[in-house]
């Protein structure tokens, strides 16, 4: 299995649009073109009442990257959650997830982790998103950028990074596992349908199953039993790797759900597992000292 076979099988291909790659200097508005039309009847829209929410710039050694931040308007410092994007980048759904977390009392931060490689928001073909942008993003760069995001959050004075959690979806689900093995400051992680196995490469030398023994925080994995790109056998393999390493991990597999069952803006959305997973996320962060 090549590195992105799981993602490509899990996501429906769309029509092709040629374009010139543009380096992202700000976040996209709305939803990624690759998921149009949006399933408006199920899309959840969380308001920003009582919140400070919007785009920020995170300093890096080689410049800045855009990010979306949401937090309560009053009080703090707040427990901190990194929100890691799907394959489609930091679009409206990821921003809405940040606002949902902020309504629960968190400082939520979603950095645009593709910023150096290109802007996926104008692409309408998933294979193109993978080949032109996502496949060129090194895991080491992502880990470093997330470290910088934590430092940025701490520097605001509004984020309690001693209570640090991470959650991610699809591409970000895989990153959630990797970051929980990378940063000892992480208290807990929740990975939504993130790929667990795959071929290694120079840019992506390890997958979650390879770093199970290095996990530094408890991780909850939320998966769909009908996900065509993430076979249940690979989930079982990750379970065994965590068990053999003596790591605290839990897995919930929703039998009838496919990939992206939490993505309420897409036809893949399944309300019951999405709502159950969201409750489990809250309980997991509370249990392991993030809340």
UniProtKB/Swiss-Prot annotation:
InterPro entries in UniProt: AB_hydrolase_fold, Dienelactn_hydro, Dienelactone_hydrolase-like
EC numbers: 3.1.1.45
Range of residues in the leader sequence: 1-40
Enzyme superclass (EC): hydrolase
Keyword Hydrolase tagged: yes
GO molecular function: carboxymethylenebutenolidase activity
Official protein name in the record: Putative carboxymethylenebutenolidase
